[in-house]
Amino acid sequence: MERTFAIIKPDAVERNIIGKILEKVETAGFRIVGMKKILLSKCEAEGFYYVHKERPFFNDLCSFMSRSPVVVMVLERENAINTWREVMGATNPANAEAGTIRKDFGLSIEENSVHGSDSPESAAYEIPYFFSQLELL
């Protein structure tokens, strides 16, 4: 079994569509092994997205991710990372396939409702950023 990290972003939490996204998570065969709703500080968002610190969108991204609560999750199933990326859809909702989370719920390239690890290495960094081993069941 493989694990991946996922975030339901502020735009989705603000629109009260957490349940609709969780339905897609479960329909895709994921087991939720950790989940919590948190409010990131700007500093925590900057630490999480440090890999993008030189990119022009970094400050806007960190402000967006800390503007209101998010739901952070650890998802488990075979081929979890690639499957979650397929369920999310393309980063830009306009380019996402029908039935994906971003096509169904995303508003823009930034407000695209969800985040997911893009590799085993990023999952290995992202999961312990938010969860201790004791929190993963």
UniProtKB/Swiss-Prot annotation:
| GO BP, one annotated term | pyrimidine nucleotide metabolic process
Q: Which CDD domains match?
A: NDPk_I
Q: Which reaction does it catalyse?
A: a 2'-deoxyribonucleoside 5'-diphosphate + ATP = a 2'-deoxyribonucleoside 5'-triphosphate + ADP; a ribonucleoside 5'-diphosphate + ATP = a ribonucleoside 5'-triphosphate + ADP
Gene3D superfamilies from the UniProt entry: Nucleoside diphosphate kinase-like domain (3.30.70.141)
List GO terms (cellular component aspect).
Answer: cytoplasm
Record bears the keyword Signal: no
Active site: which residues? H115 (pros-phosphohistidine intermediate)
Q: Keyword check for Magnesium, yes or no.
A: yes
Q: What is its EC number?
A: 2.7.4.6
Q: Which Pfam families match?
A: NDK
Q: Which cofactor does it need?
A: Mg(2+)
GO molecular function ontology, one term from the record: ATP binding
PANTHER family noted in UniProt: NUCLEOSIDE DIPHOSPHATE KINASE, NUCLEOSIDE DIPHOSPHATE KINASE DDB_G0292928-RELATED
Quote the subunit structure annotation.
Answer: Homotetramer.
Q: What is this protein's record name?
A: Nucleoside diphosphate kinase
Q: Which organism is it from?
A: Geobacter sulfurreducens (strain ATCC 51573 / DSM 12127 / PCA)
> Lineage, please?
Bacteria, Pseudomonadati, Thermodesulfobacteriota, Desulfuromonadia, Geobacterales
Q: Which gene encodes it?
A: ndk
